[in-house]
From Swiss-Prot:
Record-given protein name: Efflux pump membrane transporter BepG
Family matches, as InterPro entries: AcrB_DN_DC_subdom, Acrflvin-R, MdtF-like
Organism of provenance: Brucella suis biovar 1 (strain 1330)
Species lineage: Bacteria, Pseudomonadati, Pseudomonadota, Alphaproteobacteria, Hyphomicrobiales
Induction of the gene: Induced in the absence of BepDE.
Role this protein plays: May contribute to resistance to some drugs, such as deoxycholate, sodium dodecyl sulfate and nalidixic acid, in the absence of BepD and BepE.
Length: 1074
């Protein structure tokens, strides 16, 4: 027998355990640390610009051609795009979890290339960018000038030139990006009146710059081939691209016959300024450059953040005077706090388990064995997780906490059986260990396989939910496998070394005290056996009880709200500020500053970073929107004053509700960063029949109004609207052509004056920047300024646009969004207080069903999509777990009926779990479902050993009811030991506060309630079910095969039935528990 080798050679078992532990400790130093496994779907972004174009023009000219080609690219889940009134286009394609981001990028690039032939020339000239996108925030860094000596232009470009690229090279950083639009550009601000007086047009400026600001490659002198012996070879250089404003000022626009010339400085103001002024960054009211740092997939978040901090400290040494930086948000602070709290919970659970085991065993030496064996299993698990490419995260650590109850049971089974053999036979520890292992080796292996059959199938579920389950299931499975190895090697070896023979033990005060405690436990065991004796005589009632428990669990499952993952206090939330359509940037900035100043004074708030001119919800720059990133003080500090992120959000909502000129929308971070932009649900209303944007907006507003009247929904909103004031230019094309003016020249003149026209590039500061021409401020204020623009006809005459265009006012969309190749309106919302996210999604679906007209549909996206997919998989998960457990139990018992009893006993635990969730008001989310899977395993394990002992006695010829009583009596002590240890180990989860408290309570509550029910009800139900099903089995065997299943029962067993259990309670000193 394998265990005998290690009992005789305990140092070999100890060495194996040390090697496993060392491997785990080494892995702990190398394994990536993150809040969650790598479950954020990879994304690829496509960006393009059509300067001066409206949202509808961008959609028609860019979005539709590109999305028609990209749609259906390999591994795509969904795609969404935004076409803005500022001429920008952004498409985000989201792919399946586990797909290769690089391959995704190549596939999208190939599809976009097919669409480029259908794009406007101006768009392709500026370039269509395709790149993989990191969506998992790591940190937000702001560059600021405490003494206000630097403006936004300097701060933004200092960050772009000196900080962003350096941060992008930090190991573990996937992307570093500046939120600002103040990149350097050579801005040519021309004066329309000056151009008119000199008989020039904006196109003349464009042509002059294009011809004189060029990259020159003029060749070489003396380069081969040469017919004679050339002695020298020289490379020729000349003035190519211009590098500063003075050189651009001297560009010649027109050379006159008399030798005079018109230079750019005669008609325009030239300066090194910003490429775009669409957004303005602030930190606590002062100018700032905001840099977002994203984590690379699969990297160590904590190590990457530490690397960023180190690099910023290095860069700070070379900062000019008056420049500083601040890390205004760091996700790893929450991650580190979460990991710290979970590890603390793990240690607390372990200590409580050890205390319970000590109380039940009553022997310090015996307690020492599981105390040593359990850490080996848990620490060794890290080594396997590292090899599998997993990270140390909340899921894997939760799995270890829950695995303690399973892992400790293996060691308890060994120790308890060795103690029992020593007490009954008087054998010395080594011999007793050998005999005990002969009895339990097969059950340990079989039970391990049965439990693996519960967990392993869960690991094959696809998608994000499947990735969460896989991390959990594989962590528990690895811990169980190592625990089984320990139970066959380390635990029996330690029993042979640590335990003492029962004969001749001296009774100290401590020993006598523990004897009394053990005697009390024995009396409880006798009482339990007495109750079981009565119950098995009414075993048929177990079927009624199981039916009642099953019905109760089912009913509770229908009324307990469902969810995806609980929202947490991550120390940060967003505030989106929206002003009326067409509100100017300066007007928006004033309102943002007012709200910013108010929030900064609130209790618990540390910093407020604002980006005026940016809509976080829509993901584009708009003049009437602003974003505020509110960073809170450390959670430990806020908890002293009982302030959570939800309290601050509620206060912000209350204060901003009184602002008449704006609407403020507060958004907590989503449970998984990178999966959705905020908490709550994300919904896409789709126009599936190509109606107008105005009709889509009308339907969206009607849907939002109906949703907000539903009591299960709150703060449902959409920012999509078509009431933005716009001016529509009608070009008289016939008249223009008759005067020799090309409509294309008219459009280019308008674009150059009003929209900002990209001419070409220039080089300075080691970078390449854009050259942009645009009219001066006074030339683009009113409609009258449009009429003053001139174009040149083919005859050389100057033609004012007043004679070629007319202007009319109209209302139109500020932007247009598309989802999966349909024009769409993005709608976001939240569950009402006390309502789960699952109920909110169901309510929104019902509102959609009754409200949406024909031709309109909807799709869920972000966390809502994942939650619905998870909800659809829950039943499959439990069904797979139960099916595989049943099949392995059939193999264990060589019976098709006995395993049914073991599995039916789990209904008590399921009912208890659902009842606990209902009482506490928690949702049946992924964490709760993870706990229920563990509950199935642990409750099954208790039933397996009770039934195994009863089955062995029955096969020895003991009467059926008596065999059930003996099996229950023999396993009562270790079952209660494991159950109490596990239940007490869950207490730190159930009462958790601090980082990830909602997650810890979610995962702990279901198992806590389930194990209480399984311990209080299941231990009585299991022997009853065994009697019923074994009786059916034997009856069927006798009727079908016409012979008894077992040999003739021994008469002495039957005689003992009247006097109680065959194994009478022994005195504590006989059991060796002193």
């Amino acid at each position: 027998m394998l265990s005998s080798v290690f009992i005789n050679r305990p140092r070999l078992a100890i060495v194996i355990a040390i090697v496993i532990t060392l491997a785990g400790l080494i892995a702990v130093t190398r394994i990536p640390v993150a809040q969650f496994p790598d479950i954020v779907p990879p994304q690829v972004s496509v960006t393009a610009t059509y300067p001066g174009a409206s949202a509808e023009t961008v959609e028609a000219a860019i979005a539709q051609p590109i999305e028609a080609q990209v749609n259906g690219v390999d591994d795509m889940i969904y795609m969404s795009s935004t076409s803005g009134n500022n001429g920008t286009y952004t498409l985000t394609v989201t792919f399946k979890v586990g797909s290769d981001p690089n391959l995704n990028t190549v596939n999208v690039q190939n599809r976009v290339r097919l669409a480029e032939a259908n794009l406007p020339q101006e768009v392709t000239r500026l370039g269509v960018t395709v790149k993989k996108q990191s969506s998992s925030f790591l940190q937000i860094i702001t560059l600021l000038s405490p003494d206000s000596r630097y403006d936004e232009l300097f701060l933004n470009n200092y960050g772009v030139i000196n900080v962003v690229d350096r941060l992008a090279r930090v190991p573990g950083v996937g992307q570093a990006q500046s939120f600002g639009t103040f990149n350097y550009s050579m801005r040519i601000w021309f004066n329309t009146d000056a151009l008119t007086s000199l008989n020039l047009t904006p196109n003349d400026i464009v042509n002059a710059i294009s011809s004189q600001n060029v990259q020159a490659a003029v060749g070489r002198l003396g380069a081969p081939p040469m017919t004679d012996q050339q002695q020298i070879q020289l490379t020729l250089t000349t003035q190519g691209r211009l590098t500063d404003a003075k050189q651009f000022e001297n560009i010649i626009i027109r050379a006159n016959p008399d030798g005079s010339s018109v230079r750019l400085k005669d008609v325009a103001r030239v300066e090194l300024a910003a490429q775009s002024y669409d957004t303005i960054g602030r930190l606590n009211g002062k100018p700032a450059s905001v840099i977002a740092v994203y984590q690379a997939p699969g990297s160590n978040a904590v190590a990457a953040a530490e690397g960023v901090r180190n690099v910023m400290e290095q860069l700070k040494q070379s900062f000019p005077a008056g420049l500083d930086y601040k890390i205004t948000y760091d996700t790893t602070v929450f991650v580190s706090s979460t990991i710290h709290e979970v590890i603390k919970t793990l240690l607390e659970a372990f200590v409580l388990v050890v205390v319970v085991v000590f109380i039940f065993l009553g022997n310090f030496r015996a307690t020492l064995i599981p105390t040593l064996a359990v850490p080996v299993s848990l620490i060794g698990t890290f080594a396997v997780l590292l090899v599998l490419g997993f990270s140390a995260n909340t899921i894997s650590l939760f799995a270890m906490i829950l695995a303690i109850g399973i892992v400790v049971d293996d060691a308890i089974v060994v120790v308890e059986n060795v103690e029992r053999v020593m007490a009954e036979t008087g054998l010395p520890p080594k011999e007793a260990a050998k005999q005990a292992m002969q009895e339990i080796t097969a059950p340990i292996i079989a039970i391990t396989l049965v439990l693996l059959s519960v967990f392993v199938p869960v690991a094959f579920i696809p998608g994000i939910t499947g990735a969460l389950y896989a991390q959990f299931a594989l962590t528990v499975s690895v811990a169980m496998l190592i625990s089984a190895i320990n139970a066959l090697t380390l635990s029996p070896a330690l029993c042979g070394v640590f335990l003492k023979p029962h004969q001749g033990r001296k009774k100290s005060l401590y020993g006598r005290t523990m004897d009394k405690l053990s005697s009390g436990i024995e009396k409880i065991s006798d009482g339990y056996a007495h109750i079981v004796r009565r119950l098995v005589r009414m075993a048929f009632l177990s079927i009624v009880l199981v039916a009642g428990l099953g019905a109760g669990a089912y009913f509770l499952n229908t009324i307990v709200p469902t969810g995806f993952l609980p929202e947490e206090d991550q120390g940060l939330f967003f505030v989106q500020v929206n002003l009326p359509p067409a509100a100017s940037q300066s007007r928006t900035a004033a309102v943002v500053s007012e709200i910013e100043a108010d929030i900064t004074k609130m209790a618990g708030v540390a910093d407020v970073t604002s980006v005026t001119g940016f809509s976080f919800i829509d993901g584009l720059a708009v003049s009437n929107a602003g974003l505020m990133i509110v960073t809170l003080k450390p959670l430990e500090e806020r908890l002293k004053d009982n302030i959570t992120v939800f309290d601050v959000i509620a206060e912000v909502n209350r204060r901003t509700a009184a602002i008449p000129s704006a609407v403020a929308i507060t958004m907590n971070l989503p449970p998984i960063l990178g999966l959705g932009s905020s908490g709550g649900f994300q919904y896409q209303l789709e126009d599936q029949e190509g109606q107008s944007p105005q009709q889509l907006a009308s339907v969206a507003q009607g849907l939002v109004m109906a949703a907000n009247q539903n009591p299960k929904l709150s703060r449902v909103f959409t920012t999509f609207a078509t009431d933005t004031p716009q001016l529509n230019l009608n070009i008289d094309r016939q008249k223009a052509l008759s005067l020799g003016v090309s409509p294309n020249n008219i459009i280019q003149a308008l674009q150059s004056t009003l929209g900002g026209y990209f001419v070409n590039n220039f080089n300075t500061l080691g970078r390449t920047w854009q050259v942009i021409i645009q009219g001066e401020q006074q030339d683009r204020k009113t409609v009258e300024d449009i009429y003053r623009i001139n174009v040149r006809s083919s005859h050389g005459d100057m033609v004012p646009l007043r004679s070629l265009v007319s202007v009319e006012e109209r209302l139109g969309p500020l932007y247009i969004t598309r989802y999966n190749n349909y024009r769409s309106a993005s709608i976001q919302g939240n569950a009402a207080p006390g309502v789960s996210s699952g109920e909110a999604l169901a309510a929104m679906a019902q509102v959609s069903k009754t409200t949406l007209p024909s031709g309109y549909g909807y799709e869920w996206t972000g966390t809502a999509l994942q939650e619905l997919q998870a909800a659809g998989q829950t039943s499959m998960i439990l069904a797979l777990a139960v099916l595989f457990a049943y099949l392995f139990l059939v193999a264990l018992y060589e019976s098709w009926t006995i395993p049914v009893g073991v599995l039916l006993s789990v209904t008590a635990g399921l009912a208890g779990a659902m009842l606990a969730l209902w009482i506490t008001g928690l949702s049946n989310d992924i964490y709760a479902q993870i706990g229920i899977v563990v509950l199935i395993a642990l409750a099954s394990k208790n039933g397996i050993l009770i039934v195994e002992f009863a089955k062995e006695r029955r096969e020895e010829g003991v009467p059926l009811e008596q065999a059930a009583i003996i099996g229950a009596r023999q396993r009562f002590r270790p079952v209660m030991m494991t159950s109490f240890a596990f239940i007490l180990g869950l207490v730190p989860l159930v009462i958790a506060v601090g980082a990830a408290a909602a997650s810890r309570r979610a995962v702990g509550t279901s198992v806590f309630g389930g194990m209480i029910a399984a311990s209080a009800v299941g231990i009585f139900l299991i022997p009853m079910l065994y009697v019923v099903l074994e009786r059916v089995r034997e009856w069927g065997h006798a009727r079908i095969l016409r012979k008894p299943l077992y040999e003739e029962e021994k008469q002495e067993k039957a005689d003992g039935d009247a006097s109680g259990p065959t194994v009478p309670p022994t005195q504590p000193e006989d059991r060796g528990l002193s």
